[in-house]
Amino acid sequence: MDFLARLLGRESPGSKNVAKERLRLVLIHDRADISPQLLQLLKNEIVEVISKYMEIDDKGLEVSLEHVDKQVALVANIPIRKMKRAANI
């Protein structure tokens, strides 16, 4: 049935929302003049620095650009497992 809906041009709400979110991210990147490669590099460096002081959960890590009040904001959600002791740093 899903195949038939796609064939007739009826997308599932999930794929529509995914496409909308992808377009939103592309527009934000364009407005901020930051390429996806630069954002990935920034994410890697943030993880590298924070990992010196904290044990983080890489799987739950999210770094994105968001449009807030006519400005672009870098938003990082970094789950912390535990703090490293001073002796471990």
UniProtKB/Swiss-Prot annotation:
The keyword Cell cycle applies. Keywords: Cell cycle, Cell division. The keyword Disulfide bond does not apply. Gene3D superfamilies: Cell division topological specificity factor MinE (3.30.1070.10). GO terms for biological process: cell division; regulation of division septum assembly. It holds the Pfam family MinE. InterPro entries: MinE, MinE_sf. It comes from the Bacteria. Prevents the cell division inhibition by proteins MinC and MinD at internal division sites while permitting inhibition at polar sites. This ensures cell division at the proper site by restricting the formation of a division septum at the midpoint of the long axis of the cell. Belongs to the MinE family. NCBIfam families: minE. This is Cell division topological specificity factor. It comes from Desulforudis audaxviator (strain MP104C).
